[in-house]
């Protein structure tokens, strides 16, 4: 099974591609970066175009994303919803199934603590995925955590709230 983890953002969208067989292996991870000067429609098009390249290269089976969280800024929340929608539609066109996890569940699956800090999650990810360092923006490590949550061994997944 190949899992695509996405951490959507209006300017930086993290992605991770993991392969789960008897173990979990990192195939790729990084971030889709949008120009701040671009209009919303151009940013969405860029995200979809880059996402399609990832889908064509790795042929994932499932899309894993965090559920919607509360945002203080309505404009930011609206844009995040548009990015999530673009990602969902694109992945649906490619036949991916969809799994959604709460931020607390992701932290619990990776670090064993639903209130873990980003640093604790990154530290555990390095150990779980046998990485010496996680390069790139935090959005990339968040996407790795989201993908790991779906690809993690069943005993961990069954304990999530």
Language-model features and meaning:
Residues 1-161:
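Phosphate- and other anionic-substrate recognition elements at nucleic-acid/protein interfaces
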């Amino acid at each position: 099974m190949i899992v695509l983890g996405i951490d959507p953002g209006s300017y930086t969208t993290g992605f991770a591609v993991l392969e789960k067989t008897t173990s979990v292996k990192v195939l790729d991870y990084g971030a889709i970066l949008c120009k701040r000067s671009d209009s919303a429609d151009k940013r969405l098009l860029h995200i979809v175009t880059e996402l399609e390249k990832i889908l064509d290269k790795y042929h994932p089976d499932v899309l894993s994303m965090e559920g919607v969280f509360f945002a203080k800024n309505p404009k930011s929340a609206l844009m995040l919803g548009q990015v999530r929608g673009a990602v969902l539609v694109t992945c649906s066109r490619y036949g991916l199934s969809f799994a959604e996890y709460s931020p607390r569940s992701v932290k619990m699956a990776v670090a064993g603590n639903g209130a873990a800090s980003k640093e604790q999650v990154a530290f555990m990810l390095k150990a779980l995925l046998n990485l010496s360092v996680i390069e790139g923006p935090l959005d990339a490590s968040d996407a790795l955590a989201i993908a790991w949550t779906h690809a993690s061994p069943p005993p961990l997944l069954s304990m999530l709230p």
